[in-house]
UniProtKB/Swiss-Prot annotation:
Keywords: Cell cycle, Cell division, Septation. This is Putative septation protein SpoVG. Could be involved in septation. GO terms for biological process: division septum assembly; sporulation resulting in formation of a cellular spore. It comes from the Bacteria. Belongs to the SpoVG family.
Length: 88
């Protein structure tokens, strides 16, 4: 699996969510609404989720192993940091 495209929409409200991202995998499948969030230990990538009737959040789509998660997270954060640096 290869991340072939990352599209970033910055969130400018000053909150913890910094951007909403769409990731294309193998030029064949896209996952929308991935979030870049500022946490206590820096930026992290949150997979798209929805709230269940009992108030919990459940991922809609997510990697099923650590290797896939790392590839997606690295591609997303690299694109975000590259775009952020280009805006200054």
């Amino acid at each position: 699996m290869e991340v072939t495209d990352v599209r970033i929409r910055k969130v400018l409200d000053g909150g913890k969510m910094k951007a909403i991202v769409s990731v294309t995998l193998d030029d064949a499948f896209v996952v929308h609404d991935i979030k870049i969030v500022e946490g206590q230990n820096g930026l992290f990538v949150a997979m798209p989720s929805r709230r269940t009737p009992n108030g919990e959040f459940r991922d809609i789509a997510h990697p099923i192993n650590a290797s896939a998660r790392a590839r997606i997270q690295n591609a997303v954060l690299e694109a975000y940091e590259h775009r952020d640096a280009a805006e200054f």
